[in-house]
Amino acid sequence: VKYPGVEATKGVIEETLGLKINYWAMIDLKGFQQLINAVGGIRLDIGKRVPIGSLHGPKGVYDWIEPGKNVKLDGFHALWFARSREYSTDYERMLRQKCVMNAMLRQLKPETVLTKFQAIADAGEQIVATNLPAGEIGTMLDLAMKGKSQPMGSVSFTPPLIVPMNPDFAKIRRIVAEKIAASEQSAAPSASASPSGSATPGSSTTTKPKSTKNQTDNLDSVCKVSS
């Protein structure tokens, strides 16, 4: 097995969520930073300061990502925004990571990401790999383009929904299946009016998530992603 870590992770995810994962892509932290730089960065509305550095590291917390509207993050700052652990909870960090992924989906052109991803892989300086066959690239690009116009939902298997020390795997699989089924139904063409709280082009939504921010049917309403 060429990538045993990837295969082990894939197997755990499939068993836990009840999903079949056909393809994967892997990029290390330096490669991620380089990819974000290569596509021109991402923009996010940031609600609170995010520290750069570690209280346990030699430099400590040495800088901050400041809050603001439509903040542009390069690769270095996008990586720290997603992974910073100080002065926050694991659940808050999970949400920041989801917001980064949502921003990438909304703002980046799939064909550009593919080109830059391949360029980074060819350079050989970072760990970049995928099992996606060349013949499936066009299909994945089409899916990515369709995904840009759809809301990204989120569910986190954390307390009180799931107890980490004694997870109910049957419940997890049921929730995943229900979420996917609901998203497929909502994506179907409908003559009904737009849901309340949805944003129209050029406007912003003020809808609050019905539960916690990590449990939402539309990350745009939580992350305020700039398009």
Task: Locate predicted features.
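A mature extracytoplasmic/lumenal domain signature
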Residues: 25-31, 40, 48-50, 159-161
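Second-shell loop/turn segments in exported
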Residues: 1-3, 18-23, 83-92, 106-111, ...
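Surface-exposed patches in mature extracellular/periplasmic domains of secreted proteins
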Residues: 21-28, 46-49, 112-119, 184-191
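C-terminal solvent-exposed extensions
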Residues: 73, 129-227
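Extracytoplasmic/secreted envelope proteins and their assembly/folding machinery
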Residues: 6-14, 29-33, 37, 75-79, ...
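Structural recognition of the beta-strand scaffold that forms the well-ordered cores
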Residues: 23-26, 80-81, 154-156
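Flexible, polar/acidic helix-loop-strand segments at domain edges
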Residues: 34-115
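Mature, Sec-exported extracytoplasmic domains of Gram-positive
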Residues: 3-5, 21, 44, 49, ...
